[in-house]
From Swiss-Prot:
<keyword id="KW-0967">Endosome</keyword>
<dbReference type="GO" id="GO:0006906">
    <property type="term" value="P:vesicle fusion"/>
</dbReference>
<keyword id="KW-0812">Transmembrane</keyword>
<protein>
    <recommendedName>
        <fullName>Syntaxin-8</fullName>
    </recommendedName>
</protein>
<keyword id="KW-0564">Palmitate</keyword>
<dbReference type="GO" id="GO:0005768">
    <property type="term" value="C:endosome"/>
</dbReference>
<comment type="similarity">
    <text>Belongs to the syntaxin family.</text>
</comment>
<dbReference type="GO" id="GO:0005484">
    <property type="term" value="F:SNAP receptor activity"/>
</dbReference>
<dbReference type="GO" id="GO:0005829">
    <property type="term" value="C:cytosol"/>
</dbReference>
<dbReference type="InterPro" id="IPR000727">
    <property type="entry name" value="T_SNARE_dom"/>
</dbReference>
<comment type="function">
    <text>t-SNARE which may play a role in determining the specificity of membrane fusion, protein transport and vesicle trafficking within the Golgi/endosomal and plasma membrane/endosomal systems.</text>
</comment>
<feature type="topological domain" description="Cytoplasmic">
    <location>
        <begin position="1"/>
        <end position="234"/>
    </location>
</feature>
<dbReference type="GO" id="GO:0031201">
    <property type="term" value="C:SNARE complex"/>
</dbReference>
<keyword id="KW-0472">Membrane</keyword>
<feature type="region of interest" description="Disordered">
    <location>
        <begin position="110"/>
        <end position="154"/>
    </location>
</feature>
<dbReference type="GO" id="GO:0048210">
    <property type="term" value="P:Golgi vesicle fusion to target membrane"/>
</dbReference>
<dbReference type="GO" id="GO:0010008">
    <property type="term" value="C:endosome membrane"/>
</dbReference>
Length: 255
């Protein structure tokens, strides 16, 4: 299952590298930070799968070949290159040259010795036998209860890759936030321009209305001034008396 998943991840990595090559070589464009984050995340996941799976020279060679095809220097290729570690145990003792003799009593004792033809190769026989103890179970419990040294779960290379991926993700988030703030600033400028234009038009209309009212008041004041200077002002009392007399006559006729 891990091998199938690793093959699928390698196919995805190959597609990403081909797309990146077309972007750099054909379009002459630089990859964005999101592209770098995606590529490094894919490389990190493949490295984890290679470390978990059984050694496979074909998949390792394919991965390193795809890694070499990355066209730009935004990704440190040597940092993501996978090198198979071959563990050799030089102190391993051949089991075929050892024989066991078991003495069965209340407890079981196992003694390991070599043949006579192998004694001349090594003078002393290494102490590989288990000494007899009255309470073997207690000694086993004590050995099991001793704290084991902690094993490193993550290598420095994986830790550096994870930190670099986190930094790139933070950079992409900050870039998206900056773009959002820029769009908000542009929208606020558009709103400001629209409000200013509306206020200017309202002020112009208000000034026109005030000017019209001022002209109307000036005409009315001139008319009143002309009325005050007319002859009707001098004969106004007589006219009022005549109007009152006519009104009285009409009342008398009606009654």
């Amino acid at each position: 299952m891990d091998v199938l998943k690793l093959g699928y991840e390698l196919d995805q990595l190959s597609d990403l590298v081909e797309e990146r090559t077309r972007l750099v070589s054909v379009l002459k464009l630089a990859p964005t930070s999101n592209d770098n984050v995606t590529l490094k995340r894919q490389l990190g996941s493949i490295l984890e799968l290679l470390q978990k799976c059984a050694p496979n020279d074909e998949l390792i060679s394919r991965y390193n070949t795809i890694l070499d095809k990355i066209p730009d220097t935004a990704v440190d290729k040597e940092l993501y290159r996978f090198q198979q570690q071959v563990a050799r145990n030089t102190d391993e003792v051949s089991k075929e040259s050892l024989k066991k003799v078991r003495f069965k009593n209340d407890d079981e004792l196992t003694v390991m010795y070599k043949d006579d033809d192998e004694q001349d190769e090594e003078s002393p026989l290494p102490s590989t036998h288990t000494p007899y103890k009255d309470e073997p179970l207690q000694s086993q419990l004590q050995s099991q209860s001793q704290p084991q040294p902690p094993q490193p779960m993550v290598s420095n290379q994986e830790l550096f890759i994870n930190q670099q991926q986190q930094l790139l993700e933070q950079d992409s988030h900050l870039g998206a936030l900056s773009q959002s703030i820029g769009r908000t600033h542009d929208i606020s400028l558009d709103l400001n321009n629209e409000i200013v234009s509306q206020n200017d038009s309202l002020l112009v209309d208000l000034e026109n209305l005030i000017d019209n009212n001022g002209r109307n008041l000036n005409r009315a004041s001139r008319s009143m001034h002309g009325f005050n200077n007319s002859r009707f002002k001098d004969n106004g009392n007589c006219v009022i008396i005549l109007v009152l007399i006519v009104v009285l006559l009409l009342l008398l006729l009606v009654l």
